[in-house]
Amino acid sequence: MKWMCSICCAAVLLAGGAAQAEAVPNEPINWGFKRSVNHQPPDAGKQLNSLIEKYDAFYLGNTKEKTIYLTFDNGYENGYTPKVLDVLKKHRVTGTFFVTGHFVKDQPQLIKRMSDEGHIIGNHSFHHPDLTTKTADQIQDELDSVNEEVYKITGKQDNLYLRPPRGVFSEYVLKETKRLGYQTVFWSVAFVDWKINNQKGKKYAYDHMIKQAHPGAIYLLHTVSRDNAEALDDAITDLKKQGYTFKSIDDLMFEKEMRLPSL
């Protein structure tokens, strides 16, 4: 009987040790980087660069090419997303829209339009929580719930890009979301544009879009911003004049795969 107890105890200890070995840190990290200067790519630092690379996340495109990738966070609708879509259609630019459950449920017609016009719909979670406070099952539920609602509208099940709510994440969150098949997309260009009661005018948004531009830039823009909606047309026009081209996150992923060494 004693030997059976010993074996059981040993098994429990081994299982516990394996679980500890597999555990990863869950301390919250706020995404950030040293902002672009003189149109050079920004740098998130050695530690962050190493962490996100480990889990196939990214915040830059090909920094050797004057390419820009436009991404938008859609937590709720403030009346400006249609104008943003009009501008993208005019310039034949494909955007990636990271949507919450609230946005999808509240604005099915805009989700349908995004899909019909060839844009990418990314996942911004259902309730916009700090994912570091959630269990693995809760994280999956947050993301699956968005996908299910989008599928009801578009009939598509290709929502594989994720942007962590509030830009807060951890190694644990990166690990779990990668396990679920997501690629986490951060950003290299951003500014304070989400305060709807403190909009600063078209010039403010335009200046940031131009000043922070750099090769391989991934822009984060909030569609609740009147400033962004008013500045986007001129910004795209003038960035093209500066030699920039606009590509989609799908284009970037295809190029990354093409650059991988063959086995």
Curated annotation (Swiss-Prot):
Disruption phenotype: Spores have no muramic delta-lactam structure in the cortex and cannot germinate. Mutant spore peptidoglycan possesses many MurNAc residues lacking peptide side chains. Gene3D superfamilies: Glycoside hydrolase/deacetylase. PROSITE patterns: NODB (PS51677). It comes from Bacillus subtilis (strain 168). The gene is pdaA. Residues 66-247 form the NodB homology domain. Keywords: Cell wall biogenesis/degradation, Hydrolase, Metal-binding, Signal, Sporulation. Optimum pH is 7.0. This is Peptidoglycan-N-acetylmuramic acid deacetylase PdaA. It is an enzyme of class 3 (hydrolase). A divalent metal cation binds at residues 124, 128. GO terms for biological process: carbohydrate metabolic process; cell wall organization; sporulation resulting in formation of a cellular spore. Its EC number is 3.5.1.-. Pfam families: Polysacc_deac_1.
